[in-house]
C-alpha cells in the first residue's frame, strides 16, 4: 500500500509499504529516498512517536495514512521532573519528544502508569500529543508531576438555557480539561465556552482545586460570541499590554483585566480609541473595536480642575474637567449643560481650533483657562486631497475652514509641514487666509497637493 511521510519543511514523501513492515523498515525506506540516517528520524502518527520494533499494523496505519517526520536534534538534553514529595527525577529527552514519550520514561524510572501522571510546566498542564518544543521546554527545565486522584467527583454545569450537565472530574483537572469534557457531551468547542464560578471567569491553565471547586459545585457556562480576540492597550510610558477579550466585553471588563495585569484601579483608568474616551457600560462592539485594535490608556489625575467656556452670545459656562479629558469629553459635558450636539461645537483656545482626539493637556489648557465655543454651520463635509504620488487623502472640513486649517489637517495626517504645501483647485493656487467657501470648494471636491521645493520662492 502507499503511505505518505510529511517533513517539517512541508515536503511530502510517498512510500510503498506493507502493514507488516516495522518502523525500522520504514525508516530505511526514508533513508533510501532522502538520505536521512534512521537514528536521526522520529516518526509521529496520531500524536504518538512510533517505536522501531513495532509494525504499521500495530499502530493501525492504513493505506494513504500520513506520518510526520521529525529530525532528532543531534544529541538530546536533560530535563528534571519534580514530584509532590519533593523528589527530583532526571530524564534524557529531545525537543521533539512528545509528552506521551516523557510519561513513558517516567514510568520506566518510577513505575507510575502514564494515565495517572499529569505534567505541569509554567502553570500549564501538558497535553499528550504535543512535543517539548511546542511548550518551549529547554535543557534543564523543570516539570512538575502531579498524580491524578483515583476517584473523582461530580460537578454540575448550568447553561444559559437552564440545562444542567453533570461531569465526572478531579480536583486536579484544569479548566481546559473541563471544557473538553463539555465539548464531548454537548459539542461546544472550548474556545466558545466561558466558565463562571462564584462570579469569576475561570482561566484555562488553572485547576478546579485552584478555585476551590468541590464536589457538587455548580459552574455556569456562558457562550462566547464568535470566539475571543486579542487587543492591545498602549500606556503613556509606551508599554503595550495584550488582552484576551470578546466583542461583548464591556469597558468595565476591560479595565478589570488591565487591573489584573498592571494593578491600576479601574477608577484611575481612562481608555481612548479613535480619539474617543470609552464609557464603562458600553461594549467593545459598540465602539467597533475589532481584533488587534489598539486602545490608549491614560491615567486620571486625582482631582480635577475648572475651566470656562465662552459662547458667541457672551454666556460663560463653567466645567469640571481633568487634564486628561479629551476634547470629545469636554464637548459631551457642554452638551449635558447646554444641549448643543458635539458635532455642532467648535472649541477655540489661543486662536487654535481644538481637535476631538486630543486632551486638554495636549493644548496646555490649565485650570481656569477660557475656551471659546463657536457653532458649526450645518455640519461638515468631506474633501479629497491628491498628491503627486497618486495617493488620495480624505479630510473632514467645513466651508468656513481656511486654507491654513486644511494644511494643518494634512500635516496631522501626513506629517508634511504647511510651509512645504501648495494646494491647487481648478488650476488655482489657494491662499492661506481664504476659506474653502471663497473658492467654491464643495463636498467631495478634490484638491491637488504640490510640495514646495526647499529654498524656493
From Swiss-Prot:
GO terms for biological process: response to salicylic acid. Keywords: Cytoplasm, Isopeptide bond, Nucleus, Repeat, Ubl conjugation pathway. The keyword Lipid biosynthesis does not apply. Residues 457 form a propeptide. It is found in: Cytoplasm; Nucleus. It comes from the Eukaryota. There is a cross-link at residue 76 (Glycyl lysine isopeptide (Gly-Lys) (interchain with K-? in acceptor proteins)). GO terms for molecular function: mRNA binding. Residues 1-76, 77-152, 153-228, 229-304, 305-380, 381-456 form the Ubiquitin-like domain. SUPFAM superfamilies: Ubiquitin-like. Pfam families: ubiquitin. Its main location: cytoplasm. One of its GO terms (cellular component) is nucleus. Belongs to the ubiquitin family. Ubiquitin exists either covalently attached to another protein, or free (unanchored). When covalently bound, it is conjugated to target proteins via an isopeptide bond either as a monomer (monoubiquitin), a polymer linked via different Lys residues of the ubiquitin (polyubiquitin chains) or a linear polymer linked via the initiator Met of the ubiquitin (linear polyubiquitin chains). Ubiquitin is encoded by 16 different genes. Ubiquitin is generally synthesized as a polyubiquitin precursor with tandem head to tail repeats. Often, there is one to three additional amino acids after the last repeat, removed in the mature protein. Alternatively, ubiquitin extension protein is synthesized as a single copy of ubiquitin fused to a ribosomal protein (either eL40 or eS31) or to a ubiquitin-related protein (either RUB1 or RUB2). Following translation, extension protein is cleaved from ubiquitin. This is Polyubiquitin 10. It comes from Arabidopsis thaliana. The gene is UBQ10.
Amino acid at each position: 500500500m502507499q503511505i505518505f511521510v510529511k517533513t517539517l519543511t512541508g515536503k511530502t514523501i510517498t512510500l510503498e509499504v506493507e502493514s507488516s513492515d516495522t518502523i525500522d523498515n520504514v525508516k530505511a525506506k526514508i533513508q533510501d529516498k532522502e538520505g536521512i540516517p534512521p537514528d536521526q528520524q522520529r516518526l509521529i502518527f496520531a500524536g504518538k512517536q512510533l517505536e522501531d520494533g513495532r509494525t504499521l499494523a500495530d499502530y493501525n496505519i492504513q493505506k494513504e495514512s500520513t506520518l510526520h517526520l521529525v529530525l532528532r536534534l543531534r544529541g538530546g538534553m536533560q530535563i528534571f521532573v519534580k514530584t509532590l514529595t519533593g523528589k527530583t527525577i532526571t530524564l534524557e529527552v529531545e525537543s521533539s519528544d512528545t509528552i506521551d514519550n516523557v510519561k513513558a520514561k517516567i514510568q520506566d524510572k518510577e513505575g507510575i502508569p502514564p494515565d495517572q501522571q499529569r505534567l505541569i510546566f509554567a502553570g500549564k498542564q501538558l497535553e499528550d500529543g504535543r512535543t517539548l518544543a511546542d511548550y518551549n521546554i529547554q535543557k534543564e527545565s523543570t516539570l512538575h508531576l502531579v498524580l491524578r486522584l483515583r476517584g473523582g467527583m461530580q460537578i454540575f454545569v448550568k447553561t444559559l438555557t437552564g440545562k444542567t450537565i453533570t461531569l465526572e472530574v478531579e480536583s486536579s483537572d484544569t479548566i481546559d480539561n473541563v471544557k473538553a469534557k463539555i465539548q464531548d457531551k454537548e459539542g461546544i468547542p472550548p474556545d466558545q465556552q466561558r466558565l463562571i464560578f462564584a462570579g469569576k471567569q475561570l482561566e484555562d491553565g488553572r485547576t478546579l482545586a485552584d478555585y476551590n471547586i468541590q464536589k457538587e459545585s455548580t459552574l455556569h457556562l456562558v457562550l462566547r460570541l464568535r470566539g475571543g480576540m486579542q487587543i492591545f492597550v498602549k500606556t503613556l510610558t509606551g508599554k503595550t499590554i495584550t488582552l484576551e477579550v470578546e466583542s461583548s466585553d464591556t469597558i468595565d471588563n476591560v479595565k478589570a483585566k488591565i487591573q489584573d495585569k498592571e494593578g491600576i484601579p479601574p477608577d484611575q483608568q481612562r481608555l481612548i480609541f479613535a480619539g474617543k474616551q470609552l464609557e464603562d457600560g458600553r461594549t467593545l462592539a459598540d465602539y467597533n473595536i475589532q481584533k488587534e485594535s489598539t486602545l490608549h490608556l491614560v491615567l486620571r489625575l486625582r482631582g480635577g480642575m475648572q475651566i470656562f467656556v465662552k459662547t458667541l452670545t457672551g454666556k460663560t459656562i463653567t466645567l469640571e474637567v481633568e487634564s486628561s479629558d479629551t476634547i470629545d469629553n469636554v464637548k459631551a459635558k457642554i452638551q449635558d449643560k447646554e444641549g448643543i450636539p458635539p458635532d455642532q461645537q467648535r472649541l477655540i483656545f489661543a486662536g487654535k481650533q481644538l481637535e476631538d482626539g486630543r486632551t486638554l493637556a495636549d493644548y496646555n489648557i490649565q485650570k481656569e483657562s477660557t475656551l471659546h465655543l463657536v457653532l458649526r454651520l450645518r455640519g461638515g463635509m468631506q474633501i479629497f486631497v491628491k498628491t503627486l504620488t497618486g495617493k488620495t487623502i480624505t479630510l473632514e472640513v467645513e466651508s468656513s475652514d481656511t486654507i491654513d486649517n486644511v494644511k494643518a489637517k494634512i500635516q496631522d495626517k501626513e506629517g508634511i509641514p504647511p510651509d512645504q504645501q501648495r494646494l491647487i483647485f481648478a488650476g488655482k493656487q489657494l491662499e492661506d487666509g481664504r476659506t474653502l467657501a471663497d473658492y467654491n470648494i464643495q463636498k467631495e471636491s478634490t484638491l491637488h497637493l504640490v510640495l514646495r521645493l526647499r529654498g524656493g520662492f
